[in-house]
């Protein structure tokens, strides 16, 4: 359709009119205020990471105070009873042996120790007559004196262990077995198992005891005996006994009766054995 000039002018006016209405709506027409619709902003919820609750620091557990146990230990030897000692004891005792006078100078000395160990170098029993050098046997009453002095641990392995043969071993072991329960002896071992071990617990500390000898003055292990000494050159048996006992005690005490008679000089055998 073709529009004439007047039609074009009318269209232009309408277009302008529409534009005026739009502008007027925004800016206000004829100075009249235009109220815009109220806008109610909605709160925006944002998930924020939650701060962890502070963890209370635990109080440190105090280290337990270790319990310290102390044992005072003495070792004495050799208790070798010659004729003059037991004859004097018999004279003092009359109808028995009284060895107290022989040890009078030691009275009270051993009270300062918790454990008193002694090498009893002679067989002790009442089956054999008392005898001195060279084949010793000591009356059993000597152990009353030794016990009263404070001795509780006795080593029986030394060069005089076989002085009275198998019967001497048996008589001596029977005597020691009759002593009070707190007496511990070692040195005569079961010759099949070697496992009759000696233990003692003092102040919560467990001791194990082993004792050996270098020789028995040339006397062999007596025939007919089930018990005997272990010689220091029997390394295999010694190693086994030590391995057996170590797990069962806090302290393992091993005594070795060895050396050259009549001198304090250390010989090669002593040095090698100790090392």
Which residue ranges define each predicted feature?
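Short, Lys/Arg-rich N-terminal segment immediately upstream of the first membrane anchor
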Residues: 1-6
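Acidic, metal/ion-coordinating pockets
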Residues: 7-11, 15, 19-275
């Amino acid at each position: 359709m073709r529009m004439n000039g007047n039609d074009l002018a009318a269209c232009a006016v309408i277009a302008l009119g529409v534009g005026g209405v739009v502008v007027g709506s925004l800016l206000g027409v004829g100075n009249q205020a235009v109220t815009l619709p109220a806008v109610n902003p909605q709160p925006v919820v944002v998930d924020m990471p939650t701060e962890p609750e502070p963890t209370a620091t635990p109080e440190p557990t105090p280290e337990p105070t270790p319990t310290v146990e102390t044992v005072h230990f003495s070792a004495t030897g050799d208790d070798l009873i010659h004729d003059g000692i037991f004859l004097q004891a018999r004279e003092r005792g009359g109808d028995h042996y009284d060895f107290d006078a022989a040890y009078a100078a030691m009275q009270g000395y051993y009270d300062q120790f918790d454990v008193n160990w002694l090498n009893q170098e002679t067989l002790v029993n009442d089956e054999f007559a008392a005898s001195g050098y060279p084949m010793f046997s000591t009356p059993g009453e000597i152990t009353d004196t030794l016990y009263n002095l404070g001795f509780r641990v006795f080593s029986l392995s030394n060069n005089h262990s076989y002085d009275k043969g198998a019967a001497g071993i048996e008589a001596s072991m029977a005597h020691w077995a009759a002593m009070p329960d707190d007496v511990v002896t070692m040195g005569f071992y079961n010759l099949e198992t070697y496992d009759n071990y000696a233990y003692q617990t003092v102040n919560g500390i467990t001791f194990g005891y082993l004792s050996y000898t270098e020789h028995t003055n040339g006397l062999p292990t007596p025939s007919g005996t089930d018990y005997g000494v272990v010689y220091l050159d029997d390394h295999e048996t010694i190693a086994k006994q030590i391995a057996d006992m170590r797990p069962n005690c806090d302290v393992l005490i091993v005594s070795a009766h060895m050396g050259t008679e009549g001198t304090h000089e250390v010989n090669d055998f002593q040095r090698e054995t100790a090392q």
